[in-house]
């Protein structure tokens, strides 16, 4: 049986942690930043985990990561 291809777009957006959770970056950080507060932009820099309902689908896209 052939290997499953990794979805390259998902590979650039998500990383698996040591415990198997999937990390993701926040949205709203690329442009139109002038009206956002420093605190909001600082908090958006922190990583977050994928919701539990999406975890299975994301893991199928990045099987070897």
Curated annotation (Swiss-Prot):
PANTHER family: 54S RIBOSOMAL PROTEIN BL35M (PTHR33343), LARGE RIBOSOMAL SUBUNIT PROTEIN BL35M (PTHR33343:SF1). HAMAP family: Ribosomal_bL35. The lineage of its organism: Bacteria, Pseudomonadati, Thermodesulfobacteriota, Desulfuromonadia, Geobacterales. The keyword Repeat does not apply. Residues 1-23 are annotated as: Disordered. SUPFAM superfamilies: L35p-like. One of its GO terms (biological process) is translation. GO terms for molecular function: structural constituent of ribosome. Belongs to the bacterial ribosomal protein bL35 family. Residues 10-23 have a biased composition (Basic residues). It comes from the Bacteria. This is Large ribosomal subunit protein bL35. Gene3D superfamilies: 4.10.410.60. Signal peptide: none annotated. GO terms for cellular component: cytosolic large ribosomal subunit. PROSITE patterns: RIBOSOMAL_L35. Keywords: Ribonucleoprotein, Ribosomal protein.
């Amino acid at each position: 049986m052939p290997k499953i291809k990794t979805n390259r777009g998902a590979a650039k957006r998500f990383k698996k942690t040591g415990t198997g959770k999937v990390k993701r970056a926040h949205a709203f950080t690329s442009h139109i930043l002038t009206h956002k507060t420093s605190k909001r932009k600082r908090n958006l820099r922190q990583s977050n985990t994928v919701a539990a309902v999406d975890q299975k689908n994301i893991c199928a896209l990045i099987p070897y990561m």
